A protein has these predicted regions:
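Exported/periplasmic ABC-transporter solute-binding proteins
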Residues: 1, 7-160
Length: 160
């Protein structure tokens, strides 16, 4: 292969949330999903976006995929999905927790952190493509305790 042997590592795990800019719309059980009291719900495209696939898995685990299918609007990625909700085109949507805690502006509203048991881990991975002291140093830093604390502060879980 074209990668350095044993250099592939998961350094962060994405966390899926259901978010709305409307205060108190989403409760701790995401009851709104069962009530279906919304016109549209945004998600990333599950065919090309890991968070979209995690959303599909979540709704399937909750036996809601078929029931909500006609209300789903799909963004190409979670950035576009966030914009659908933030602009009001959808009342709520599934995004990355990091988009709420790491925003260039204050993000208001309500959210439900999706239990990890409802979707496969969303691994953020790194791999070295060639021998380079700088790349190896960066990889060491990325996997260091110092870096992991920063990554965690920005809304990601740390793999064991």
């Amino acid at each position: 292969g074209k990668t350095i042997n044993k250099s592939r590592h998961a350094y962060a795990l994405g966390q899926l949330v259901l978010w709305s800019p409307i205060d108190d719309l989403i409760d701790t059980k995401a009851s709104i999903l069962q009530s279906r009291d919304f016109r549209f719900i945004a998600m990333a495209n599950p065919k090309i976006a890991p968070y979209g696939e995690a959303t599909r898995q979540t709704l399937t685990s909750m036996n809601l995929w078929k029931a909500l299918e006609e209300k789903l609007i799909r963004g190409e990625n979670i950035a576009q999905t966030f914009q659908f909700v933030n602009s009001g085109n959808a009342k709520l949507g599934f995004i990355s927790f990091s988009q709420i805690v790491n925003s260039n502006y204050e993000v208001n509203g309500s959210y439900w952190k999706v239990p990890k048991s409802l979707y496969e881990p969303i691994e953020q991975q790194v791999v070295l493509l060639n021998e380079s002291f700088l790349a190896e140093d960066f990889l060491s830093y990325l996997l260091s305790e110092e870096s992991q604390k920063i990554i965690s502060r920005f809304g990601y879980d740390i793999p064991l």
